[in-house]
Amino acid sequence: HCKNLKVIGVLRGGMENVNVSYAESKGIKVFNTPGRNADSVADFTLGMILSEARNIAKGHLGLKNGEWIRTYPNSATIPDMPGRTVGLVGYGEIGRKVEKRLQGFETNVLVYDPYMKGEPVYGKKVDLDTLLKESDFVSLHARLTSENAKMIGARELSLMKPTAYFINTSRAGLVDESALYDALKSKKITGAALDVFEHEPPGIDYPLVTLPNVTITPHMAGGSQDAFFNTPKKLAKRMMDAGI
């Protein structure tokens, strides 16, 4: 119906909401904005790691409720960051920015990405099982596809250290939430920090929300003001670079 349409601009990295092949068959160029909120998500990921491992959000909530909480689910194993190993599942722009930021914390970095070419800038490229077994923090940064849906399930979680933390600021569909709930409930892993859920908003009775060893946020990792204002600029630059 849009006979004069020449260009479609997508203000996000993924183009799942556009039939790209059909558009291109009609001579319509499609542009997206990969990495539009990469800094925002990378910053937030580091915040989630620290918040869950050091009980920042839990301590804050306790004081707000008039409680002086000194004991937490991970009190016996609270870690410092130097010398710890962070495993990054996915090495797109967000994963690379998280890796760079982690250098300031003197951590070791492992990277798994089946589509990755070459080696990580700072970390070490490994297979997924090795990453899960050796990491103190496992952080997801992969795009959700039909091939990797629920790539983290009961088997994968069972490979993680009992002192490890699971971080997801990416997509809920990458994880089997029932398996994650079981792993956290049974303390097969120490904790998790989650910004995304299979059903949003999850509600106070949502299984993962009810657990004491989870830091939760309402899908806000990419929501910085800088990301909001920079996205149209990134899209415009991509179009201009293509001669539009």
Language-model regions: role of each:
Residues N74-P162:
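Rossmann-like dinucleotide/phosphate-binding beta-alpha-beta segment
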Residues P34-T85:
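Phosphate-binding beta-alpha-beta segment of Rossmann-like dinucleotide-binding domains, i.e.
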Residues L11-R12, I28-D39, S170, H219:
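Short beta->alpha connector loops at strand-helix junctions that form conserved
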Residues C2-L5, E106, S135, T163-A164, ...:
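Short, well-ordered alpha-helix to beta-strand connector turns
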Residues H1, V18-S25, Y115-Y122, P202-T210:
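Short loop/helix-cap segments at secondary-structure boundaries that form the rim of catalytic
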Residues V30, T163-I244:
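Rossmann-like dinucleotide-binding domain for NAD(H)/NADP(H)
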Residues H1-F31, K133, G153-R155, L159:
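An N-terminal-biased, well-structured beta-alpha scaffold segment characteristic
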